[in-house]
Amino acid sequence: TFYEDRTVETQNYLAPGLTKTDKYSRTNRVFGIGINDANVEVFNDRQFRDEYDMLIKRILKVSPKTAFIFETNNDSYRKVRKKKYVQHPNGEVARKSFFMLADKHKAGVWDKFSIMGGLGSMAKWEKADLAKKDKVHFKTAGYQLLGDMFYKALMQAYFDHIADLPAEVPQAPQAIQANHP
């Protein structure tokens, strides 16, 4: 969770170099954050959105041309006692929060929660040896698979975008006129 007393740590972790103003260059930020913030017994989705909204505003203050992509949280389970886990509905609630933030900030969303199978899907990922026993985090192979899926989706969106651009008519090179006396 973003706290005021951790500003420098958060800035450096999420946006290295954020302290210097960069009003001209366009940067992209992918937010794949929030699973630990949402993996609590009582989840306040408004506070969740407000804290990430504050972080986004801080980034936009020094880098106004930044584009954002939000990665929704994954499905997760909550440990209630030793070796006893229950489905955690907060992933779905956090997912909706990311879509609301994306709408507000005209950002993209990669819906990891739905892609992995929605509520209850983390058990399948664990059974496939892609998730850790805590039923919150992934094993290396799971993170690599998700990274590959994200990359392919991003590249496909880019290729779709450039395919929709208007074709440019090639211009003939201008003849160079020599100044001869």
Tell me what each language-model feature is.
Residues 1-50, 137:
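Conserved SGNH/GDSL esterase-like catalytic core that processes O-acyl groups on lipids
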Residues 24-29, 63-68, 104-108:
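Loop/turn elements at helix/coil->beta-strand transitions in domains of secreted/extracellular proteins
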Residues 16-20, 58, 153:
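A generic secondary-structure signal
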Residues 3, 32, 71, 94, ...:
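Generic beta-strand/beta-sheet core signal
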Residues 7-9, 35-40, 74-78, 115-119:
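Solvent-exposed loop/turn segments at secondary-structure junctions
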Residues 52-57, 95, 99:
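Generic structural signal for well-ordered alpha-helices
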Residues 32-36, 58-92:
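Active-site segments of SGNH/GDSL-like serine hydrolases
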Residues 75-181:
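Catalytic His-Asp segment of secreted/periplasmic serine-dependent ester chemistry enzymes
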